[in-house]
Amino acid sequence: MTKNKIPEVLILGLPNAGKSTLVNALSKRKTSIIGSTPNTTRDKVTTTLEFEDEKKLLISDLPGFLEDPDDINIKFQDNILRYVNKANHILFLIDVQSKNYSGLDSIFKLINNNNLQNKTTTVFNKAENFEIENLDKRMYKYIFNTELFISAYHKKGLDVLENILKKLSKKSSNVNDRKSSIVIVG
């Protein structure tokens, strides 16, 4: 991160983990398109979160990570590695009920193989009626540094996540003022 750059947090996860819903909940506006069809988000969508004391942070919604992308999605998947290596922090968003361990393993390997563990927070989403003690034991390996249980759709548990994001934000007098951007690849 350079002196004049707003810190960026990426939301990385499988399709339909709730990445776009989380961006919209945190930004308090409809920044990302939400759909039940996997890969509704095909491009990186970035918006600015503003906190008290003129602190700012960019939060980016990425397309869902695919283990075996088709010809249409391969361009978007190729850019994910570039994005995560440039990010200041990564939110590894997991649907708490997911059984796609192969897909989660692929993201886990991407994080580990690129030494991104120290800048990754694991966020279990869709946990509105979930008891933490019922977390599948296989999920524990995906926890980096901190784990949170939230419901982006019901806006539960977001206060703890917002506190983490505030700590990562930077005073706006020290950064270029950028409201939002959309990167279209391909």
Question: Where are the regions a protein language model picked out?
Answer:
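Canonical P-loop GTPase G-domain recognition
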Residues: 118-121, 128-181
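Conserved G1/Walker A P-loop phosphate-binding module
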Residues: 1-83, 94, 167-186
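Conserved C-terminal guanine-recognition region of P-loop GTPase G domains, centered on the G4
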Residues: 51-55, 75-146
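Conserved nucleotide-binding/hydrolysis micro-motifs of P-loop NTPases
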Residues: 39-40, 64-66, 97-99, 126-130, ...
